[in-house]
Amino acid sequence: MSPSPREQANAAVREFLAKRDWAAQTPARKRILVAFLRLAATNGYNSVSMRTLGRELGLKAPSLYSSFPKGKDQIVAESLLWFTHGFARDLLDAVQESPCAGDYWAALVRFHVAQQVSTPEADLWNLLVASDKVAGFLGQELREELAFWQSLHEEMYTAAAEEMGLAVTRQTIQAIFTLLDGAAHWSAWDGTVAHLESLTDYGVALSRSLLEAGTRTPAGA
């Protein structure tokens, strides 16, 4: 029996995750990456320098450069990849036990909304990737890897739609991503778990409305 579209999408994410071994990352490097993401998400990417990062960590510049010889550019690249792989791994954990396509879609959306609303680093990731399309400050290899992850993420949604019998277009999927990526801006989260759960449910309802509005015809018609 052939794997379902969802199973194929999940398998592609597992293959993507297997390409990098983050277990080998030293505690010192992880600490620097976490601090960079936190500072950049709070104060803005341009406000973070090797000096401000060192001050945040209580480290001298030589200690930072011993972990990241190429300086801030290397830290930016590795922090983006580290966040990407963490997001992908946690997303896979959140959806892979879903019993049906509808539940899988809902799990995708709930995770996406929760990340965007409660994790400032997710908004930073979107900002840096969007800014790179204009300014081109990320390296080509990094740009391609991030774009590849975006395509895998979109394919998870496409797979769910296909199993629900909906012939979805890429334009519709991108419209849904625009909605979900902007969750921090339309949610007005009050910081409580109950409100976050309500917001994720709302995200599911909005995404299904967009999905159905953008569907050309039922796949089985």
Language model feature labels by segment:
Residues 1-26, 215-221:
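N-terminal intrinsically disordered/low-complexity leader segments
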Residues 19-20, 79-105:
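Amphipathic alpha-helical linker/stalk segments
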Residues 20, 31, 39-74, 78:
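Helix-turn-helix
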Residues 28-36, 53, 75, 79-87, ...:
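Generic hydrophobic, amphipathic alpha-helix propensity
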Residues 85-88, 92, 126, 135-163, ...:
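Amphipathic alpha-helical packing segments from all-alpha helical-bundle domains
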Residues 92-119, 173-176:
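Hydrophobic alpha-helical connector segments
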Residues 104, 116-140, 185-188:
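Amphipathic alpha-helical segments used for helix-helix packing
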Residues 114-119, 159, 166, 173-194, ...:
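Amphipathic C-terminal alpha-helical segment
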